[in-house]
Swiss-Prot record:
Region (Disordered): 409-429
A GO term, aspect molecular function: DNA endonuclease activity
Gene transcribed to yield this protein: UL98
KW Metal-binding (keyword) present: no
Organism: Human cytomegalovirus (strain Merlin)
Its EC number(s): 3.1.-.-
Residues carrying the site annotation Required for function: E216, D254, E278, K280
Protein name: Alkaline nuclease
Amino acid sequence: MWGVSSLDYDDDEELTRLLAVWDDEPLSLFLMNTFLLHQEGFRNLPFTVLRLSYAYRIFAKMLRAHGTPVAEDFMTRVAALARDEGLRDILGQRHAAEASRAEIAEALERVAERCDDRHGGSDDYVWLSRLLDLAPNYRQVELFQLLEKESRGQSRNSVWHLLRMDTVSATKFYEAFVSGCLPGAAAADGSGGGGSHYTGSRAGVSPGIQFGIKHEGLVKTLVECYVMHGREPVRDGLGLLIDPTSGLLGASMDLCFGVLKQGSGRTLLVEPCARVYEIKCRYKYLRKKEDPFVQNVLRRHDAAAVASLLQSHPVPGVEFRGERETPSAREFLLSHDAALFRATLKRARPLKPPEPLREYLADLLYLNKAECSEVIVFDAKHLNDDNSDGDATITINASLGLAAGDAAGGGADHHLRGSPGDSPPPIPFEDENTPELLGRLNVYEVARFSLPAFVNPRHQYYFQMLIQQYVLSQYYIKKHPDPERIDFRDLPTVYLVSAIFREREESELGCELLAGGRVFHCDHIPLLLIVTPVVFDPQFTRHAVSTVLDRWSRDLSRKTNLPIWVPNSANEYVVSSVPRPVSP
């Protein structure tokens, strides 16, 4: 279904059985069982290879326990490395005092055959870890790319859930950084592990989250057609991208552009200037079309109307703060524009920023306050309407779907729109040319304009996007032919998309929705998108990443009594993220 050999998330019984395999031997227990008696040289084994060895072991146990092959491409590639004669020779020479080459080869063959190792076979994974450490770096990166491929489908994919167990994911990073809560470092006895993580992974039961799941596909199409103007995104989505430099950080992304699935293995290639769009559907703003604030947006379609809509909720979607004031962490958008948003100011003094963030918050606010959001207002109507109400004539763009009048030529920021030549001219609607549009509700652009709102670097979503950008950047850096000459402008960028919908009126009930040439069966109609660019400070990213990696490695070392080494490539990220000095 998603191009992976994994089980459907909807099969609760099967997924529960697979998670039970992980619960039976969590990462910490695997490390103690495997390496406590082989600590000589363990300090030199990076966590990246330990993570790969553990993933292979869990998938092999799944096959033996349930007879279901999981992550077969990954398993096949690791088995091929285990049988690599060159790597076996090097391993035998380096560890001749511990075992003969024949003994090492026999152990690695048992691993490749996925044999039952309950009878003293844990040493096999010592040799597998050492062998993976000898493999070229690009081979290790390819294995992490295969894990991403095997986890596509995200919450519907069992591999995605399993990999998240031992990952500080983008959604967990904020708590790991601010409060030191480390969900990936499971207890050594396995308690409190699988159940709690599994519940968190399946938290899509609230109305707001269900609303986002149902409408995410439509929002992706709107971004593709009206923000990126037809640029091809990653089709069928991405799985869990695990940072190949640490093996610990991970990110699951909603929508990516400039990332290709290449070769027969369909692994990822990150191109220069890739873009990530993090989508947030604002369930709390779902209103009827006759709501006065919705009508105000559709009639006036300007920043003041949108600001009024955002302020109509008891907890406004944009928080106003003065230039020198500290924001709260309640909402993910901020504004310094008193004329539009001063009414959102609360007299209660906000809490102080958490200690790890306090030193950097002013700089992060300074970097982001110069950015401006772009608002795109939408409406939908039947194409056989006579437009007698004075609405703009609807035209159809040959590649992008629908537009209203010349709204597509409005005053949008160039960095969000692309060059003027990206889109072909609109084609007038004719019944005989487009019969498939009749009887459907067709989404079209009403207007677009700027909104003085920027991202709140104190909110947890900022940290979620920070890790998305960091992990994707590491894949770009690792695959770059000349990393020392990377242009910082070629690294991935991130945008936050806030999507607001309205309810259908009576005449719209039961009609299919058409957007970007695709049919959707959504219960609601898109009202507007707010697209906000996000700016990161490489120095702060290094600080945040280093803090979490250090905490996690110390915590797991304490629980396992092993010297866990989690590599940290944040310095290399900083070098690639800042302009190079001008040559004299």
